[in-house]
Amino acid sequence: MQATEANFDGLVGPTHNYAGLSFGNVASQNNEKSVANPKAAAKQGLRKMKQLADLGFHQGVLPPQERPSMRLLRELGFSGDDATVIARVARDAPELLAAASSASAMWTANAATVSPSADTNDGRVHFTPANLCSKLHRAIEHESTRRTLRTMFNDTDRFVVHEALPGTPALGDEGAANHTRFCEEYGARGVEFFVYGRSEYRRGPEPKRFPARQSFEASRAVAHRHGLADEATVYAQQNPDVIDAGVFHNDVIAVGNRNTLFCHQFAFVEPNAVYDELRAKLSGLKAAFNVIEVPDAQVSVADAVSSYLFNSQLLTRPDGKQVLVVPQECRENPRVAAYLDDLTSRTGPIDDVLVFDLRESMKNGGGPACLRLRVVLDDAERAAVTPGVWIDDTLFGRLDAWIEKHYRDRLAPADLTDPHLLAESRTALDELTQILGLGSLYDFQR
């Protein structure tokens, strides 16, 4: 059946800030305590969505989560009215207020792992929200993610939204940031590719400096849950040395689309074996496989991490050609810029490069790929999605005006103690659910 890939980008929330919460994420740590601009962050992300929609891509939006999370703070023993709780946490445990206020749900590549209906044993699209149990500020996301996905993809004849895996390090799951899918055509059966950093029960190399967040056991559990066939599933271990260099998810060192894998030379343990298995399993589906492996001599791992070359979107345009969507930092790094010029000058799967200003997200370690969740949908499935979430001229205008009305243009870490920020955020989110047609999505609306 004819199908296409839709991208659902996370709308940056009103509490976007730089608290340095993500150990192993170099940009997050380097920009700790900087002053953020939530309004600019949200508009940068929205402009990317609009430009891609204008180019003919199916582009949706996922709403922010409620922050600060008063549920978390109350579960951690703080009581009183909301203002009292915020004041107490700010005084006694400011690091918990920072975690409860994080806008990290904007990076929807970590929202869930998605398998299209062509791959699953029951012919439905499967979603497993990621437990994100390696970081407190992200481990609180999956319940809201599940509620949002079940609201947007509510036709249970076509969609299955599972619970997150149990939140233990043995099943640490970071979602689609460590998953991609290869196929000849989106609607055809494909090979799903799961990348992990460590195994709880198998011996193997592990990073020494920064933690590996994705376990093999989690990847395998998601594949089993989604009803994927063994002959169309590949597991690969991420190179622990690149994790120690700041590659905290596989989408910082590799990106795939249809029958093309674009990756760094040092992305994987035993890369040739990985490529061979992908090629063999795709061949069994009568699909080709292309690898564009970037040599370390041309783009070092450090350059890849600082520019986010691989945290890009690789998209198939309506004319069948592929385009790479990169952050502007790629043009500001002379070695990466030279590589991209060479890439598009030669004959190959990637014909063009689109550059976006995503500076506010990038300073927290999130490029174009982090901001989007890929969902392959056929025509009937796409028609079953809540209609108000698709980006077009009208929705863009309404969201742009909504951001202008509700978002601050300056947010320092000290501003998280302001009880008015919670009220501002709730007012904004209440209006947003009406714009998107999502009903009473948030706890404060129920």
Curated annotation (Swiss-Prot):
InterPro entries: AstB_sf, SuccinylArg_d-Hdrlase_AstB
Positions contributing to substrate binding: 19-28, 110, 137-138, 213, 251, 364
Entry superkingdom: Bacteria
UniProt enzyme class: hydrolase
Annotated GO biological process: arginine catabolic process to glutamate; arginine catabolic process to succinate
Gene Ontology terms for molecular function: N-succinylarginine dihydrolase activity
EC number: 3.5.3.23
Signal sequence, renumbered to the chain: none
Catalyzed reaction equations: N(2)-succinyl-L-arginine + 2 H2O + 2 H(+) = N(2)-succinyl-L-ornithine + 2 NH4(+) + CO2
Disulfide bonds: none
Keywords: Arginine metabolism, Hydrolase
Key word Transferase present: no
Quaternary structure and interacting proteins, as annotated: Homodimer.
Function: Catalyzes the hydrolysis of N(2)-succinylarginine into N(2)-succinylornithine, ammonia and CO(2).
Family of the protein in this entry: Belongs to the succinylarginine dihydrolase family.
Protein name: N-succinylarginine dihydrolase
Organism: Paraburkholderia xenovorans (strain LB400)
